[in-house]
Each structure stands twice: as structure tokens, then as C-alpha cells.
Amino acid sequence: MARETEVESSHDGPPKVTETSPSPSPSPPPPPLPPRQMISSDSPAQVAPAQAKPTTAVSSIDISTVSFPDGSRGTFSTSAPRVGFTPHTNASGYGTPGRDATGGDLADSMSVMSFAPTLRPHGDLASLVADGLNKKSRAWNMLRSQSETVQPFESIELGAPGSLAGFEREFDEIPDDKTDDIRMAIWKSKMKHYMILSSAGKPIYSRHGDLGLVNSYMGVVQTIISFYEGANNPLLGFTAGNARFVIAIEGPLYFVAISRLNESDAQLRSQLEALYMQILSTLTLPTLKSIFVHRPSTDLRKPLEGTESLLSSLADSFTRGSPSTLLGALECLKLRKSQRHAINNVFLKNRSEKLLYGLVVAGGKLVSVIRPRKHSLHPSDLQLIFNMLFESGGIKSGGGESWIPLCLPAFNNRGYLYMYVSFFDGNADPAFSAESTAEDTPESSTDTNTTNTTEKEDEIALILISPDKESFYDLKEMRDKLAAQLTKTGHLSLIRSAARERRPQIQTIAPGAQIAHFLYKSRANVQFCMSALEPANPNPTPGTSSTTPTTVATTATVASTSTSTLEPEKMLTRRRLMTLYHELHASMHAKHAHLKVLHAVSEDAASLAWITPVFEFYCVAGPNAPRAAMAQGANRVIQWAKREEERLFIIGGGVF
């Protein structure tokens, strides 16, 4: 069949030719093409550039964040319409890439951007592209200069809700005149408990509450431990609510620590080991074993009678926060190398033949030590001695000198050594009467309260240890010679003045550093040093500025002004600080962690940990302190510690 051809005429274009087939249902014609724009030869072509558009619309509202000097933050929305993308500044003060107001593109090189949103960005964004990311706004620079002065925990008030709410009442005794329900409620409110019981279930010691009050709970603990022991799967610890239970089994004794202070199992277990060492220092290991071999149900409270104060003072030091226990190291009194060497020489020249160890201690800090060439005292043994001398107060109240049989478990847990202790206080000792008279000037005696509060720091003790129980008079004679020689050379007054200086300030060590407190441990010497913490004054007195710093460390200024308010605040700040250090230490020393540097930021503080084979360093700063500034301050403190190493630490000591 022949096809038919139609020719149509159009006014807008050339004629169209259409072929038609004899199909019974012809398809509709396609739509006409749009008219083509005529290009004038007088003007160049205006072609819009191809611009990428977002594939997902998140929000059409701009959210701005502002940081206040007290560390708090606020957010608000801006309703101004946006024309394309505009450069803006995020909460950390750094500009983020975008298009300009004219809608132009960024440079071709700006193809990747990394931004990690956090609750508290601190401006540590790593730019992968152009340097425009690191540009700070002028308003942020002005605000940052004020916010960086915020001290750790400054925004937390005493009694504020939180994990440490009520900690200021932690060491209050449970009253005996209340009903059992009230006493039990007070006991349960304590944040830290230590229990010691025998494998037969006999209670031995409890830090809070008498044994009659907690006897039933000890029975429950003994049942749980015995159940797991019977299954040949000793129980190491468990969690109940927000409390962590850690159990240590030492022969016939069970040690239990219950903590709500966010401490790791390893840290709690080291504290329980220290309590066990305290018991061994009284009984020795063979005596302890023989007691329970013959009578497993023996009540150990009678052999340990009189040592409850030592256990309680040691436990309270753990609850308050003990850097020495956390780091497993000693703190020494800062002295010049020549001065310490001269004191060691006086020691060695007047040494008795029956002397094993000789120590001079001031305010709980080691000043000088002489020892045999191949023997040294373990820090845990020295911690027991310092706890006995300076924390419990039993020896100091007994008079000017004491003779004490003592087992040092890390040195030898199977026998006793004999310790001669004498305090140099100037009043009870005629050898120091001239010195005390010279020092009792009107300026030093105007404030008796200050003198009483600093008595612990001024206490200087001479400790002479011998394996011979008949060497009392020999060591007493050595003490008299040392007293006369140290007084004559002026070394005793030198030690006392050094003890009164207390710990160094950050601004003295590294002026301008943005860290508030640090711990530095020399791993080779097993010794540490620390600084004083200076937050803003929480309760400024009339006529003083609210930003005037006040020392939180143990100082006469703090202790003599409003002790009813500052003492709980100081104790709470110390606990918060030590909680941060416990968390850092646990993270750095976690099994299989292998961390070298750790930076952590919370709502109240920023912290940094750094561990090398030479040292361990931990520091705390305000919540707005940048990481780079903290690292710079840490470097300066570490360099200072290396320069002052022979003053801060005892290297070798006197050896005979």
C-alpha cells in the first residue's frame, strides 16, 4: 500500500513534512520545542555557573552559641534569611568554609572539610584545606581572654547536686544516740567504706559505724565470697547501683572496699593492700597465720587493739585522695643539693653501729635518708611510718621520743625492726631552746591560731631504725649528737623554713601557663612533686575582688579564715581534683591500653596525662583551656622539674 505524505505550513518556521500510515489509531504528535533565544551579536553570552547544591536539607535556622566567662554556654537562633552560604563562626571561634554573599564558589582546593561536633568544642579543629578555617573572630578573641581564666570546678557550689553531693559530711561520726534506722541511713549515705573480716565471718574492722551496726552486712559479704570460693572461682568485685565492690583475699582475711568515687578496681585493690600491710606491721605474717591455723574463728580485734586509729587515718587519707598512694611514690622536701648533702654527712658522721636506716621527715615529706649500700626502703613501708607519725597522732601525743617495734612488710614481713622516733619541737628539748627563743619573735607569735594550724607542716621527726631490740640507748645517744650538730650548723632551722614554704605555685614555675595543678612523678627515683591549687575565691571577704585567688592547699591563710566554710570547700575541691587524677591514671594504666598522652575535657575541668619511661605527668586546667595551651604549659613544668631534679628528689641519699 502506498504511503500518504502531508505537507503542513507553519508561520513560525519552515514547512514540516509528516508521513502518515494507514494505521487505524495514529499516535499523538510530540509537543513542540521551546523557542530558541536569539543571541545578540552586541553583548557577550551570560552563562550562569553550575553550582552544587546540598542533597539533604538539615535546617533552615541558624543556631549560634556563646560562651560566658564562668564556663557556661548559651544558644540562640538567628532568624535573618540567608542568601546562599555565608562565612560564619562556630562556637569554638573558628571560621567554617562557605560561599560569599555574592554566591561565588570557594577555591578549587577547598574540597574537603573535617568537623567533629562535640558538646564543648574548644577550637582544636584540624584543617585539611585552606588556612581560612583557623581564622578567629574578633568577638571570640575578646571572650576567650576572659573564659580562659575560669578555674577547675569554679562553677560548682558547695552542696550542689552531683556525684560528690554530701561529701563534706563523709567523715562525720555516726551518732550513738539515734535510732537504728537513722544510724543505718547515715551509714548508707557514706561514699566510701572499708571492711575487714575473717574467713569464718568474724568482723574485724569497719571504717564507718560500730561492728554491731554493720555485722549483718558483713555476714552477707562473707556468704557471697565463700560461695564463689567454693566454686573455685574467687570473687574479685561487682557493681551494685552506683557503688563498686572490690574484694581482696589475703590468707585468712577478707578485705572489702565499697566506693562511689569512680575509682578503678586496681586503685581500690592497692588501697586494700595498704590496709593489709598496716595489719602486718603490727602482727607480722607468721604470727597472723599461726593465730588462724590453731583457731580459725579467732576474734582478731584483741590482737589488733589500739591500731584502729591507724587503720582509720590510712582509710581516710584514701577517701580524701592520696597522691602518694595513687602514684606509688614519695614526696620529698625541696632543698638545695648542697644542703641535703650536708645533712646526709652529719647523719653519716654520727651514725651508730646498730643503725639500719636513718630518716629525717618534715611535715610528712622526706628530707634525708641514710641506708646500707644494697638496701632501700619501699614507698609502702615509708607510707606506713608517715601515717603512724603524722596522721594518727598517737606517737606525737606520747611525748618527745618513742621506741616502737614495727614490721615493715615490703622489707621483711616475717620479723620486727625497732624504731626510735624523736620530734624536734623546740619546747620539750633543751637542745633547741636557744633556737626556739630566737624564732619566737612578736611577728611569729601574733597569730596563735595560724601556728596551731601549721603545726603539722612544722613538725620535724628523726627516725632511727635498728634490727637490735637492745639498741635504744645507742640510738638515743646518736640522736643527741645529731640534734646538737644540726642546731650548730643551722640545718634544723633551714629544714623548718623549707617546710613552711610549702608547695610551689604554678605561676612561679611557669608564668602564664594555663594549668591549675599538676602531679609529676620521677619513675627512676619513685618520688613525686605537686603544686598548690589556686581557684577563684568562692567566698570573697568584703573589700576584696571575687577573682582574687586563694590557695586550696594546706596553708595558714586558708585555715585561719572562716574554717567552717573553707574547710569543706577545700576538702571537696581536693576530692574532685583527685577523682580526675584517678580517672586519668586508670585510663593510662589500663590493661592493653598502651597510651602515652591523654587529653580529657568535662563540663568543669580539662585534664592531660603524659607518660614516658622517665616520668609520669598529670595536670588539670579550666574547662575552656585549649589543648595546645595545656601541652605548652605541661612542657614548661616538665622542663622545670628536670632542671630542679636534684632539689625536688633524693637521688641515692647517704649510703654506708
UniProtKB/Swiss-Prot annotation:
Main localization (coarse): membrane
GO cellular component, one term: Mon1-Ccz1 complex
Bias (Basic and acidic residues): 1-14
Membrane association type: Peripheral membrane protein
Subcellular location: Endosome, Multivesicular body membrane; Prevacuolar compartment membrane; Vacuole membrane
Composition skew (Polar residues), residue ranges: 53-67
Region spans: Disordered: 1-105, 433-455
Keywords: Autophagy, Endosome, Membrane, Protein transport, Transport, Vacuole
UniProt biased composition (Pro residues): 23-35
Family statement drawn from the similarity comment of this UniProt entry: Belongs to the MON1/SAND family.
Protein name: Vacuolar fusion protein MON1
